[in-house]
Amino acid sequence: MSQNEQYDPKVLRKLQLAELEVFKDFIKICDENGLSYFLFAGCAIGVERHKGFIPWDDDIDIGMLRDDYEKVLKIYREKYTDKYVVLDIDSQETFPFYNAEIARIGTKNIPYVFKDAKVPMGIDIALYPYDNVPDDAKKRRRQRSSVFFWSKLRILREFKKPVLFMHGWKRKVVSAMCIAVSYTHLRAHETE
């Protein structure tokens, strides 16, 4: 499937319903443990505008303040290992993102943009930690730039040829950087 192709509507609906079951378990865990969360991105738009999923949306994005985020991951790791696996940089060396995914064990879902990922991907929900930012505008920009840089470098490290939603010279430059970062990372591991 290319980045411009869509799921077969029946397959997409089946995926959405399976993700909804994962989300219902998440809600129950949060309620039982007094943890707060919020929906954002396409997920929030879907709830407001469509009273469910956006018809073409294939994921559930959840934000949590850092303390609650860390607590819920710990709960999943300690109490729900029979049903779920936490995918993040702490548990999977090759996980390419700084957020976490809670995946249902025994399922498989690999979106096109992750076709080259070397990490188990299942039917999941995506959790994003929200951290405090400095009051000072200059420090805030520095923090934002740092987070952007390191998160993109992590992605480049794991995807030699990531799916790029750009064209022309920008695509060529970013592709060359991806190959260079991936190669450098590979060489570093070979010499260990």
Roles of regions detected by a PLM:
Residues I27-I60, Y69:
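Active-site nucleotide-donor binding segment shared across nucleotidyl transfer reactions
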Residues V119-K172:
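Conserved, surface-exposed functional patches that form binding/active-site neighborhoods
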Residues V174-S182:
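Low-complexity, serine/threonine/proline-enriched polar segments
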Residues D88-K138:
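Internal, conserved structured core segments that host functional sites
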Residues M1-F40:
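Helical scaffold of the NTase/Pol beta-like nucleotidyltransferase catalytic core
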Residues G46-R49, K71-L73, P134-K139:
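Short catalytic/ligand-binding loop motif for oxyanion handling, primarily in non-cytosolic enzymes
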Residues T184-T191:
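Conserved small/polar residues in nucleotide/adenosyl-binding loops
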Residues V22, G63-A103:
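Metal-dependent nucleotidyltransferase catalytic core
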